[in-house]
Every structure is written in structure tokens, then in C-alpha cells.
């Protein structure tokens, strides 16, 4: 029988493509029966949290295991190191093209890789590669972002089911119109609000929602501590998954493309460190809640490829996350009622 441990919150910070560190750790928590009353999410943590809490047409465990399937088969990624399954082309014609593709008989069997063998996943990725290559685009020098706002979440989350959950859920986005952080609550969160929360500059144009423009919240508050502090003053235990403040993500670039990834992640790693430190000093030390941080340790040999969208990297990080989650529970399980 679970001991009474009070009100618990899980904080899922930004992180991509190393988000499978968090899905792996969450699987360890799910298997151990750990439940939370509150979920506070930012950036890639929103992908992890929403797909876990309200998975579309699969169980929570299946959804967590399926997270690795949004990477690209290595045989393709080694030749074309872009995740065309996550980042899709912008424009009205591209939108119509995606809609037409989704109406093809057997479409879901091609894109849903849960339960596929490695060979089947390669064939799926190969078909999706040509779909992406043939997709029209209106990208130009006058575009405000490279990609259409996140489409992949449609395959992952049942937003109607999300609204029926008992847990309190918070997702952040930064409002450019008001120049302040916006906190979306469970009843508000739908496809549009999610896309607003993940609109990282350059990759995506600012997302217009109810006449206001938004960018990714994790670009300003890597963990959505603001949503937690403003709405949940009576927490007993706060667990933070820190997949962004990892110094091992920084390394000597392997090539110009890798250098591009490094210039994006470098300020985000610093932001993750600063946000967590600030939360400890300004909020946590003044209350009685127990703050537990799961720091992911990526082995040195895996660090150079830790920001790759290859299937092998996502699988490796998932395994690291799972082992990290198990180790965390061995040390802190009693504080979480397991």
C-alpha cells in the first residue's frame, strides 16, 4: 500500500532530441507505479508529458516506448541528417499535401512504427523520406520560420482525453505581443496551444493564437517553474527531470551541421542551469517542499551524437533515461510512495 507522501509534482523541462532521456525515465516511474498530482512542462517536456498523460490509441507504456520511433533510421540519417518526420515544410500547399497523404489507405500502418522490426522501420522511414522530398513548400527569404508548426503531435496525443484527467497540468509559452510568459492550463491545452508552446524561433514562425503571437516557453523558462509557483503553493514533493542543463551536450563540432546544433543548444544549457539555480534560491529554499532533481548522465562516448535525430541515438538515450530513472527511484522511491 502506498504511503501518504502528500502532493507531488513532476517538472519536465525542455529538451530535444534528447527528450528520450525523459521518456525512458518516465517508463521506469510508470513501471514502479509512481503517480503525480501536478505536471509542469516546457518545450520538449510538453511532448513527453502530453504523450504520456493522454496517448493516442495506445497505452502509456506503449507511448513512452514509441518515443524512439520519431527518430530516423541510421541508414538514411547518415546520408541526410535531418528529421523530416518532425520538421515538415511550411505553407498552404504543404498542409493540403499532408492532409491528402493522411487519407491514403494504410497511412497509419506506415507511420506508426510501434511493434515494427528494424527492417520495417527503415522501409517506413524510406517512404516518409520521399513523401517529405515531394512535399511542396512556400519557404522563402521572407519566411519567419523554416517549418510548419509541429504536426507530429497529432499522432501522439488525445487532447480530449487530456481534459478529463484529474491531474493539474501546466504548459508555458512566451507571448511576444504582451512580452510576458503565458501559462496554459489543462482545460486550455489543445493542438493550437501546444503548437504555440513549441514554436522555437527560426525553426518555427511565431504562432498566432487569439490575436497574439507566441514562441516556445522553454526559450525563456526552461522548466516552467513560473506555472508551478503561481498555481501550486502547497506541494510536498517536486521532481525535476533535467534533460537540458547537461554540459555533456556541448562538444567540439564534428562538422558545420553539428556546429549549427551547438550554437542552438549552448545558450539553452546555460539557461537550464540558471533557471534551476534560481528556483532553488528564490522559491524552494523558502518553502517546505522536497525538491528532487533527476540529473541525466550521458556517457562520454555517447555525447558527440547526443543531439542527433538518428534512431540509434534516441534508443541509446532512452536506455540511459530508463537506467537513470531506476537509479533515482532506488534512492528516492520512499519519498514518492513506492
Question: What is each stretch, according to the model?
Answer:
Residues 235-254, 268-269:
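A short, conserved beta-to-alpha structural element at the edge of catalytic cores
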Residues 148, 276-338:
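C-terminal helical/tail subdomains of lipid-metabolizing enzymes
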Residues 7-9, 16-141, 145-149, 185-196, ...:
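Patatin-like phospholipase
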Residues 128-233:
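Active-site gating loop/helix substructures
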Residues 15, 25, 45, 171, ...:
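Conserved small-residue
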Residues 8-9, 38, 213, 237-239:
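Structural motif
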Residues 252-277:
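Acidic, Ser/Thr-rich peripheral helices and adjacent loops at domain boundaries
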Residues 171-178, 221, 242-247, 296-302:
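Glycine-rich beta-alpha junction loops
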Amino acid at each position: 500500500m502506498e504511503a501518504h507522501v502528500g502532493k507531488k509534482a513532476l517538472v519536465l523541462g525542455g529538451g530535444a532530441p534528447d527528450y528520450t532521456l525523459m521518456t525512458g525515465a518516465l517508463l521506469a516511474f510508470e513501471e514502479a507505479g509512481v503517480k503525480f498530482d501536478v505536471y509542469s512542462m516546457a518545450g520538449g517536456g510538453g511532448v513527453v508529458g502530453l504523450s504520456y498523460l493522454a496517448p493516442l490509441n495506445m497505452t502509456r507504456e506503449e507511448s513512452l516506448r514509441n518515443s524512439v520511433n520519431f527518430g530516423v533510421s541510421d541508414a538514411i540519417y547518415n546520408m541526410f541528417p535531418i528529421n523530416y518526420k518532425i520538421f515538415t515544410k511550411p505553407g498552404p500547399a504543404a498542409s493540403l499535401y499532408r492532409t491528402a497523404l493522411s487519407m491514403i489507405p494504410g497511412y497509419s500502418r506506415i507511420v506508426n512504427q510501434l511493434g515494427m522490426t528494424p527492417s520495417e522501420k527503415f522501409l517506413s522511414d524510406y517512404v516518409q523520406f520521399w513523401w517529405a522530398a515531394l512535399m511542396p513548400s512556400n519557404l522563402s527569404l521572407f519566411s519567419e520560420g523554416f517549418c510548419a508548426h509541429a504536426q507530429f503531435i497529432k499522432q501522439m496525443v488525445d487532447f480530449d482525453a487530456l481534459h478529463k484527467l484529474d491531474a493539474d497540468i501546466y504548459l508555458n509559452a512566451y507571448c511576444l505581443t504582451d512580452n510576458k510568459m503565458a501559462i496554459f492550463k489543462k482545460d486550455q491545452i489543445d493542438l493550437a496551444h501546444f503548437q504555440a508552446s513549441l514554436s522555437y524561433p527560426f525553426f518555427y514562425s511565431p504562432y498566432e493564437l487569439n490575436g497574439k503571437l507566441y514562441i516556445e516557453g522553454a526559450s525563456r523558462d526552461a522548466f516552467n517553474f513560473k506555472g508551478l509557483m503561481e498555481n501550486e503553493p502547497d506541494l510536498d514533493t517536486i521532481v525535476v527531470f533535467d534533460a537540458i542543463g547537461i554540459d555533456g551536450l556541448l562538444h567540439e563540432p564534428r562538422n558545420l551541421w553539428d556546429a549549427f546544433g551547438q550554437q542552438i543548444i549552448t545558450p539553452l544549457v546555460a539557461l537550464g542551469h540558471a533557471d534551476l539555480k534560481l528556483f532553488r534560491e528564490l522559491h524552494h529554499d523558502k518553502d517546505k517542499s522536497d525538491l528532487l532533481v533527476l540529473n541525466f548522465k550521458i556517457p562520454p562516448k555517447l555525447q558527440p551524437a547526443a543531439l542527433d535525430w538518428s534512431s540509434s541515438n534516441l534508443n541509446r538515450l532512452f536506455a540511459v533515461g530508463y537506467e537513470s530513472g531506476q537509479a533515482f527511484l532506488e534512492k528516492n522511491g520512499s519519498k514518492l510512495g513506492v
